[in-house]
Amino acid sequence: MTSLTLKTYQQTALDALGAFARAARTKGPALAFGELAGRPYNLDAFGAQVPCVCLRIPTGGGKTVLAAHAVPLLAREWQGSDAPVAVWLVPSDAIRQQTLKALQTPGHAYRAALTDAYGEGLQVCTLDDVAQIAPPDWGRHAVVVVATIQSFRIEDAGQRNVYSFSESFEPHFKGAPEGSMACLQGLPDAVVTAHDAAQDATGVLAGFVGQPRWSLANWLALHNPLL
């Protein structure tokens, strides 16, 4: 199977998304949205600098294939990147498994929409596999991480692994450009606190108080992922 030919309403939706991304890149999300949608932009999602919009698609209208086409579109028009990081969120584990299989299957229409843009160097993985992608591959190949929304809900104590300090990310963070981690300050659970160190039976965190965690969430945040 190759890339599906998009229906007219699907292409229209992507064209609108591309127009917004291009305008947001030069004018900012709020002004771009106001000009294109004719109503005020809602800043509640990610603030004034990071664009957040919804596409209205009918039930059964091919939202997944649109998402696959939206990744290279937004990477090009908003980020100007040919090796983006995208976090693909779904509402349940069953849908996560289904989506992951499709995006990893050669020839599947969803994967084809991505490989048409990025070739077979495309990396599609789960949260558990992020640390296995070699540090030099970030920024050189497109990376799509498929996860459930619940994995990032910080109030869910059972789902906080993405924010936990993990030594498996040591080579990633130690190789990060100097000063690049300043952007992590102020993000939820991004920095090791004195309380964290006191609760750490291993003693590892004592030397990291006030510094960004070596965590999955922080590593993704460093790469300004499409969401």
Q: What residue spans do the PLM features occupy?
A:
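RecA-like P-loop NTPase motor core of helicase/translocase proteins
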Residues: 1-227
